[in-house]
Amino acid sequence: TLLTSLVSCTTYHPAGKKTVHAMRTGNESFLTKINFLSDLNWFLVHYSPDIIIVSDSSDRHGDHAALIELLQNTNAFHQIPICLTYIIHGGNDALWPSRNTQKFTRPPVCNSKMWGERISISLTKQEQEHKYNATLSFATQLKDDLENFLISFSKQEEIFFLLRDNINPQKIYSHVEYRENL
């Protein structure tokens, strides 16, 4: 469901369900940074996830890169045991991800060290088909996709990067260090 906001922007939420803000307050409201952070913090406290997976700060799409920074501004974020990141816009959307490979190649925004420490999760054929079909359901995102950008994420693996592991706190990766070494 696409919900028009009070400031002429849109937000996505499950069909027939309330937005997080309405769940928290009982009312809809303006989509401001303060409201978003309050809603996000409430959601994290209310549902207490064991793991969170969020777009990486090195993602070249501004709102994707900003999400991790917004999350880090919530009190509840630091209580989540494990945080993984992923990249969608890896530096050149026309070339990455490769359109003709079954596995991901290193995106331009990753140096060799970051790429070497990635977490790769193999997908079954059925999982690949589910991902492919799920991607096709985002018609508004596919309409201008002459390069099959979104479809190119349907591969034999999913890749993630470990940002924080409170269970093994020595495994904290410095993304600032990665960007400086690119």
List where the protein language model places each region:
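Metal-dependent de-N-acetylase/amidase catalytic core
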Residues: 2-182
